[in-house]
């Protein structure tokens, strides 16, 4: 079969042949980098429309697990940051909760989008994503509270 389903089957076959633990190597499969830099003559290069599948083929189950642990850590800390900014808003200490909620929702949308496209393959997307993730962590954990100034 062709299309996305056919490319997924070819990708999984390649993973079976090359080794599930470590994959085929970064930049060797499934994206613009692999298509533009075809370094192995006997390998067929093609694009796969799923960032998680691309990551698994390139880095194996080990790399996918490491990425998913990073994502889960971000999601947990993002929820904590939302809770803290919501509590600060209730106490009248901060007005950052709506901004943080919007950032978190947008970043979660990117994670969903990665299931259908290699969105992280674009350098600017990766830079925006992790910059906003850092801003969310700053707002929830690292920002200093305002101190009252007495004259």
Segments and roles (model prediction):
Residues 2, 14, 20, 74-81, ...:
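Hydrophobic membrane-targeting alpha-helices
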Residues 101-151:
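Transmembrane alpha-helices of multi-pass inner-membrane enzymes
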Residues 27-31, 64-67, 113, 138:
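Short, electropositive, low-hydrophobicity segments enriched in small/polar residues
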Residues 58-109:
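Hydrophobic transmembrane alpha-helices and their immediate junctions
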Residues 7-10, 51, 55, 61, ...:
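Generic recognition of well-ordered alpha-helical segments
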Residues 1-13, 17-59, 81-85:
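Long extracytoplasmic/lumenal interhelical loops at the membrane interface
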Residues 17, 35-39, 71, 117, ...:
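Short, well-ordered loop/turn and helix-capping segments at boundaries between secondary-structure elements
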Residues 21-25, 64-66, 121:
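Extended hydrophobic-aromatic, low-complexity segments
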């Amino acid at each position: 079969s062709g299309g996305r389903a056919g490319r997924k089957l070819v990708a999984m076959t390649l993973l079976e042949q090359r080794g599930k633990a470590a994959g085929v190597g970064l930049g060797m499969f499934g994206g613009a980098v692999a298509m533009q830099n075809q370094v192995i003559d006997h390998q067929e290069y093609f694009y796969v429309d799923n960032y998680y599948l691309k990551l698994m083929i390139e880095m194996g189950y080990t790399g996918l697990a490491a990425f998913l642990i990073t994502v889960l850590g971000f999601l947990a800390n993002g929820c904590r940051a939302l809770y803290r900014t919501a509590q600060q808003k209730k106490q009248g200490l901060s007005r950052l909760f709506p901004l943080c909620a919007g950032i978190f929702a947008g970043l979660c949308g990117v994670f969903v989008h990665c299931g259908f496209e290699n969105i992280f393959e674009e350098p600017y997307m990766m830079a925006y994503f992790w910059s906003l993730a850092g801003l969310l962590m700053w707002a929830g954990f690292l920002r200093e509270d305002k101190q009252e100034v007495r004259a």
